[in-house]
């Protein structure tokens, strides 16, 4: 996490202070900082990833599928925590996700891509009420419905 800061000439004390500030922000147990990734839970790994992304205080942060491979209960808990962290950071965060519910919960605006091109940008309400093309409708409808017991049987 501190490699880039070191390469940019930060003093060890400044790095340690920034790491501690970010550790508190993401509510990470201090004992985890010396761990290898395989020793961490999925939620701990995601917190460390957010710390790495925020280390150099960028104007914009990019998080690519930060909830991937997490079980649903941890995922929901981490989503709540991320929302709070994003607000406290006061940064623009670009979040890549295939989970529309996650995008709706975490984002102020959603940009839907299809085959490498932007299909529509706006709020969830905009996408829902004024879909730009049939793909937008299909994407939203596919994620709004779960199979019922009759469909599973």
Regions found by a protein language model. Give the residues of each.
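Conserved ABC ATPase "signature" region
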Residues: 13-31, 84
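Conserved ABC ATPase signature
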Residues: 36-40, 44
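Hydrophobic anchor residue at the start of the ABC signature
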Residues: 50-51
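Conserved catalytic motifs of ABC-family nucleotide-binding domains
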Residues: 57
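Catalytic Walker B motif of ABC-type/P-loop ATPase nucleotide-binding domains
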Residues: 61-65
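ABC ATPase "signature
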Residues: 121-122, 130
């Amino acid at each position: 996490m501190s490699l880039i800061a070191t390469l940019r000439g930060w003093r060890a004390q400044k790095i340690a202070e920034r790491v501690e500030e970010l550790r508190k922000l993401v509510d990470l147990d201090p004992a985890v900082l010396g761990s290898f990734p395989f020793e961490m839970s999925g939620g701990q790994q995601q917190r460390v990833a957010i710390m790495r992304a925020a280390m150099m205080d960028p104007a914009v942060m990019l998080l690519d599928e930060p909830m991937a491979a997490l079980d649903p209960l941890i995922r929901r808990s981490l989503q709540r925590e991320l929302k709070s962290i994003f607000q406290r950071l006061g940064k623009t965060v670009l979040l890549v996700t295939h989970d529309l519910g996650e995008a709706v919960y975490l984002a102020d605006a959603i940009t839907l891509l299809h085959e490498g091109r932007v299909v529509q940008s706006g709020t969830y309400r905009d996408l829902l009420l004024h879909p730009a093309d049939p793909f937008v409708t299909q994407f939203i409808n596919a994620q709004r419905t779960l199979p019922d017991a009759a469909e599973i049987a």
